[in-house]
Amino acid sequence: MSLEVFEKLEAKVQQAIDTITLLQMEIEELKEKNNSLTQEVQSAQHQREELERENNSLKEQQSGWQERLQALLGRMEEV
């Protein structure tokens, strides 16, 4: 009788070990995925910053051209 109990206990322990091993593997996969997603987020943030700088530069250029155009229109009205 005690041998049966021991075998059942051993089977449960082995099942627990197998479950723990699978969970550890899943944790490692999730860590890798998390690292990958973190890198993607950082890359997207970097691209966004670059686009914001480019946008600001283009806005400054547009403002400069608008000022020049207004100056030219003002001269044309004087003539």
UniProtKB/Swiss-Prot annotation:
Residues 36-63 are annotated as: Disordered. Keywords: Cell cycle, Cell division, Coiled coil, Cytoplasm, Septation. Residues 46-57 have a biased composition (Basic and acidic residues). It is found in: Cytoplasm. GO terms for cellular component: cytoplasm. Signal peptide: none annotated. It holds the Pfam family ZapB. Residues 3-79 form a coiled coil. InterPro entries: Cell_div_ZapB. One of its GO terms (biological process) is division septum assembly. Residues 36-45 have a biased composition (Polar residues). The keyword Coiled coil applies. It comes from the Bacteria. NCBIfam families: PRK15422.1 (NF011951). HAMAP family: ZapB (MF_01196). Belongs to the ZapB family. Non-essential, abundant cell division factor that is required for proper Z-ring formation. It is recruited early to the divisome by direct interaction with FtsZ, stimulating Z-ring assembly and thereby promoting cell division earlier in the cell cycle. Its recruitment to the Z-ring requires functional FtsA or ZipA. Homodimer. The ends of the coiled-coil dimer bind to each other, forming polymers. Interacts with FtsZ. This is Cell division protein ZapB. It comes from Salmonella typhimurium (strain LT2 / SGSC1412 / ATCC 700720).
